[in-house]
Amino acid sequence: MRMQWIWKSRRSLQNVFIRRSSQYHKPFWRRPLPATLLGCAVLGVAAVYFAKPSPIDENYPRSVAKYLHEALYRQKGENNHDFQDAWKAYQSAIKQAESEKMDMESPPVQGIRLQMANLLASAGALHKAWSMYWDILERTSKLPDFLEQRVLIASKLIELSEPLGLQKDATKAADLIVKALLSKQFNGDDEQKSRLFEQSATLYFQAGTPSYAVPLYHEALNLTMANPSCHGLILMNNLATSLLAQTETVDKKHHETLMKQSQSWSQKAVDSYYFAYPKDRNQECHAGCAAAFYTLGQIAERQGNIDLALKHYKNSEALRKDDPYNDGSMLSHIAIDRLDKDAFIKKLDKSSSPTD
């Protein structure tokens, strides 16, 4: 009898199993239990996220924090009213911090002033931003916990020095960066350190001290070796250019050595360009190789080998097809015109000279 009942009930049992198995073929969100668990997890994460106070609320009294939240919100705007409102909110935050008896030389308060300087820079008030960055740098000189921010402020000063024409004044900022990097006090990654070394080296070069730039470009290049890129070609040529520039400031007996070193680095940049797969050569690769060919042309010209100089200049100019507006190709084009004119004038002088 029992077997007969099971046989008669087989259809209903099959339906039960089919319904259960069909649950596992439904999309995840249509399964009752997993969807419920996922919803609870999302709500839990959201609750933890929104319950956790922001760094502003942790580091500032509530009366100061409210102005900072407003300032940061306004700072995201794009019109003048947003900048003005953000500036007023920062000023109110500073006044409120003073009334709350906060130490006005402490990192939190200097952090507010740093945001104000950033706002000035983004609004185009470069001279005011420059002055404020310097003031913060001087006020924080004895704050050990503010070193990384000081390095980044110094980097910002170097960035502003070029449009303001104040490269020589910014060398103190570069000194600070180099000291922090060489003493291993700055904890950025290799890419960030390389960028800071390069930025400082470029400033020293622009300020007329290429001998300071050479070791810094070398440090910047070494930090890129673990992950080679086309930017390495730019650094190699910067090294070559700095070595060549030293011939203008040192005794003539050192000129040949400096030119050989410069030639070696320029040739390394060219070799690296042709070693890379064509598909991997980006705009930086083309610009770096063009600049390296131009430097090789300069060296050959100074050595009196005009034919070789023209060859290098033409190789540089040929890279305009890949990057039409790179500096090396354009300078090479000017150099070719100059050498062609010189050759033409010499030819005229020869033909017009009296013969016996």
Curated annotation (Swiss-Prot):
Family annotation (PROSITE patterns): TPR, TPR_REGION
Molecular-function annotations in GO: enzyme-substrate adaptor activity; misfolded protein binding
Recorded GO CC terms: i-AAA complex; mitochondrion
SMART domains according to UniProt: TPR
Subcellular location(s) of the protein: Mitochondrion
UniProt feature coiled coil, ranges: none
The UniProt record lists the keyword ATP-binding: no
Organelle transit peptide: 1-20
InterPro entries assigned to the protein according to its UniProt record, in alphabetical order: Mrg3-like, TPR-like_helical_dom_sf, TPR_rpt
Protein name, entry field: TPR repeat-containing protein P27G11.02
Organism ancestry: Eukaryota, Fungi, Dikarya, Ascomycota, Taphrinomycotina
